[in-house]
A protein has these predicted regions:
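Bacterial N-terminal signal peptides that target proteins for export
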Residues: 1-8
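Conserved Rossmann-like nucleotide-binding pocket used by diverse enzymes
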Residues: 2, 17, 29
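Cleavable N-terminal signal peptides
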Residues: 9-11, 21
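Short linear motifs centered on Gly/Pro in flexible linkers and helix caps
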Residues: 13-16, 323
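Sec/Tat signal peptide C-region and signal peptidase I cleavage site
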Residues: 16-23
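N-terminal secretory/targeting leader peptides
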Residues: 24-117, 126, 133-335
Length: 335
C-alpha cells in the first residue's frame, strides 16, 4: 500500500514538473524586413521581446528574424504570419499588395502632420471598426506611420509642383507613385537595398522618403530637401490569431498590456529619434533644406487634391468605406 502510494506520488510530481517545464517553454518567432542592426530591430522588436519576457517571468522567449533571414522578405510579412511560419511580424503595408487597403488612406498627401498623431489616428480607425475586416485573420498588436515624407534630389531644385516634371524619383508605394505621375514625374519602384545603387548609377534623380530611412549614404548624394508633407507610410505589427488564442490567459494578458495603444504611442518619439541624425546631416555644407511658405504649400495641396480624390474613388471599388475613412482621419488630424 505504501509502495503504491509512493509510486503515485512520484508520478504526480513528475507530471507536475513536466507541466511546469512545458509552461516555461513558450517561444514566439518575431520577424521584420530590415537589417539586424536596424532601428526596428534595436528599438522596437528587441525591447518589446524583453518586456514580454519580464512580464511573464521568463516563461516566454521571443526569437527574432530580421530582413536577412528566410522569413525577412518585405512582401511576405503578413503572409508568413498567416501561414504560421512566424508568430509575429512587423511589415510595411505598401509592400503587401491588396492586403490592408483601407489603411492606405492615411498615406495620402498632406494628411499626417507627424508620426505620433498619425499613428494614433490610424489605430483609432482600426479600433472603431472603420477599417472593417481587413485585419480579421490576425491579432493586431500595433499600427503606425512615420513622420511625413518629403522630396529629396541630387541637384534638381524643386520649389513648385511644375518643377517635378520629368524628374525620376524612387517611390515607396503605389500611393506616392500616383501623385508623382500626376505631377509629371517618373516614379521608380525599388526595394530598399537597391535604392542607393540606382542613385549612384544615375538611374534616379531623387527619392521621396522620410528623414528616418534605412538608406545608407543617403546624405552623401541627396543634397536638396523639400519639406512638403508629401505622404506617409503605414506599418503593421500582427500576430497569428490561432497562436495568440492558444496561449495561456496570463500570457495573452501580458501581450495585451504592452501592445495596442501603449505601443502605438511610442512610435512618435521613435521616429523623431530615428529622423534626427539624417535631418541633422542635411545641415552640413552643400545641403539645402527648402521649407515652402504657406502660399506655396497651398499650391502643392491644390495640385495634389485630384490625386486624393481619384485614389479614393478607385479604392472604393475594393474598400467601399474609403471616403468615409479618409474624411474621419482628416477631421481627427485637423483637431
Amino acid at each position: 500500500m505504501r509502495r503504491s502510494a509512493f509510486i503515485l506520488a512520484l508520478l504526480a510530481a513528475t507530471a507536475l514538473g513536466a507541466s511546469n517545464a512545458a509552461a516555461q517553454e513558450i517561444t514566439l518567432k518575431f520577424s521584420h524586413f530590415l537589417g539586424p542592426k536596424s532601428f526596428f530591430q534595436l528599438d522596437v522588436v528587441e525591447p518589446w521581446a524583453k518586456e514580454l519576457e519580464a512580464k511573464t517571468n521568463g516563461r516566454v522567449k521571443v526569437e527574432t528574424f530580421d530582413g536577412t533571414s528566410t522569413v525577412g522578405g518585405v512582401t511576405d510579412q503578413a503572409s508568413n504570419v498567416k501561414a504560421g511560419k512566424v508568430d509575429i511580424a512587423l511589415g510595411l503595408r505598401g509592400a503587401e499588395g491588396d492586403k490592408f487597403l483601407g489603411s492606405s488612406v492615411i498615406e495620402l498627401p498632406f494628411l499626417v502632420p507627424n508620426a505620433l498623431r498619425g499613428s494614433q489616428a490610424l489605430w483609432a480607425l482600426y479600433k472603431d471598426g472603420t477599417l472593417g475586416e481587413e485585419y480579421k485573420d490576425y491579432k493586431v498588436l500595433a499600427l503606425f506611420v512615420h513622420n511625413p515624407g518629403l522630396i529629396h534630389t541630387k541637384d534638381k531644385r524643386i520649389l513648385e509642383p511644375a518643377d517635378m516634371k520629368g524628374v525620376r524619383f524612387r517611390s515607396p508605394n503605389n500611393t506616392v507613385s500616383a501623385a508623382l505621375r500626376h505631377l509629371g514625374a517618373e516614379p521608380v519602384l525599388l526595394q530598399v537595398n537597391d535604392v542607393m545603387a540606382a542613385v549612384k548609377d544615375g538611374k534616379i534623380d531623387g527619392i521621396v522618403t522620410n528623414w528616418g530611412n534605412p538608406l545608407q549614404g543617403f546624405n552623401d548624394f541627396m543634397k536638396l530637401h523639400i519639406e512638403t508633407q508629401f505622404y506617409t507610410s503605414a506599418f503593421f505589427i500582427v500576430m497569428n490569431k490561432q497562436t495568440y488564442e492558444s496561449l495561456p490567459t496570463d500570457v495573452r494578458a501580458a501581450i495585451d498590456s504592452i501592445s495596442g495603444e501603449p505601443w502605438v504611442a511610442k512610435f512618435g518619439p521613435y521616429w523623431d529619434k530615428w529622423d534626427k541624425p539624417v535631418r541633422d546631416g542635411a545641415n552640413a555644407p552643400g545641403h539645402e533644406v527648402i521649407v515652402p511658405h504657406a502660399g506655396r504649400m497651398e499650391r502643392w495641396r491644390e495640385a495634389l487634391k485630384p490625386v486624393t480624390d481619384q485614389y479614393l474613388e478607385e479604392l472604393a471599388k475594393k474598400f467601399p468605406g474609403a471616403r468615409a475613412a479618409y474624411d474621419k482621419l482628416a477631421a481627427t488630424l485637423r483637431q
